[in-house]
Amino acid sequence: MSAKALGGGMPIGAFISSSKIMKSIEDKPILGHITTFGGHPVCCAAGNASLNYIEKYQLLDKVSEKEALFRKLLVHPKIKKTSGKGLMLSIELDNFDEVERTMKRCMEHGVIIDWFLYNTNCLRISPPLIISNSEIHKVCKTILKSLD
């Protein structure tokens, strides 16, 4: 499943799989992978424009470097673990109270982060692919300051 960068803010996602797996869900349930809202032309046009932009500016080529920068900068005694892949990262703290306090402090300084519904001890960092290295530095500095 993919959706974050695909629509450039418009509601669209993609269900991508091998032929073997797609064949296995053909009838159990029948076409269980389709939606009732899929394929709207405006959203598809936005998706196409987003993909063109991502390719033109080679945004995927820079994701590993940006992930490494986040991981390098996000070091603090209150951070138990950093998980994730690319620009979809999780910062584990001791408890939800710490997560909520950190989120509120970050918001006061213009940085929007969230938590995971399935793991409330973790901050969710998922910036757009266009985030610059200087913005990553600002975000990390704000998070670290908010943890103090």
Where in the sequence are the language-model features?
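Conserved N-terminal phosphate-binding loop of PLP-dependent enzymes in the Aspartate aminotransferase
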Residues: 1-148
